[in-house]
């Protein structure tokens, strides 16, 4: 019997992703990464997505107060092996320590664009026009 393939993450992937997110957050909050760029930036980790085999963790981060996110993302990726090593004590239950990759989280920008679009005069006019038809 074959299992149906699904693109949705499993409960285990979600649970492990949340554990990895919490562990990375603690490493960054404690200032264990010695890098001027990382130490000078407040970094928000919104989500960690795990690969199906739990060997790759992709962390989606938003550097706050920085206009060029790519500099912070590059610094995090330079220190990814160090961060992976610091996750060990917090994730002892895992058979393999996942490789950590950092990506820029664009979801906040997408939400902002959608909000601006919904507040635009054209959309407001269309929404008000719908109420007149009823």
UniProtKB/Swiss-Prot annotation:
Instruction: Tell me which InterPro entries the record gives.
Output: KH_dom-like_a/b, RbfA, RbfA_dom_sf, Ribosome-bd_factorA_CS
Q: Which GO terms describe its cellular component?
A: cytosol
What's a BP term from Gene Ontology annotated to this protein? maturation of SSU-rRNA
| Cell location | Cytoplasm
Q: List the disulfide bonds.
A: none
Would I find Cytoplasm among this entry's keywords? yes
**Which UniProt keyword terms apply here?**
Cytoplasm, Ribosome biogenesis
Q: Please give the superkingdom of this protein's source.
A: Bacteria
Q: Which GO terms describe its molecular function?
A: ribosomal small subunit binding
- Membership in a protein family: Belongs to the RbfA family.
Q: How is this protein organized at the quaternary level?
A: Monomer. Binds 30S ribosomal subunits, but not 50S ribosomal subunits or 70S ribosomes.
Task: Summarize the protein's role.
Answer: One of several proteins that assist in the late maturation steps of the functional core of the 30S ribosomal subunit. Associates with free 30S ribosomal subunits (but not with 30S subunits that are part of 70S ribosomes or polysomes). Required for efficient processing of 16S rRNA. May interact with the 5'-terminal helix region of 16S rRNA.
Q: What is the name attached to this protein's record?
A: Ribosome-binding factor A
State the encoding gene: rbfA
């Amino acid at each position: 019997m074959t299992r149906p393939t699904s693109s949705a993450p499993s409960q285990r992937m979600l649970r492990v992703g949340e554990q990895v997110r919490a562990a990375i957050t603690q490493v960054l909050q404690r200032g264990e990464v010695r890098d001027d760029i990382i130490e000078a930036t407040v970094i928000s980790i919104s989500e960690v997505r795990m690969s199906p085999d739990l060997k790759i963790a992709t962390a989606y981060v938003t550097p706050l107060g920085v206009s060029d996110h790519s500099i912070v993302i590059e610094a995090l990726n330079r220190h990814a092996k160090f961060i992976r090593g610091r996750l060990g004590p917090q994730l002892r239950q895992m058979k393999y320590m996942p490789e950590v990759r950092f990506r820029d989280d664009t979801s906040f920008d997408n939400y902002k664009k959608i909000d601006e679009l919904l507040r635009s005069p054209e959309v407001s006019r269309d929404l008000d026009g719908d109420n007149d038809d009823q």
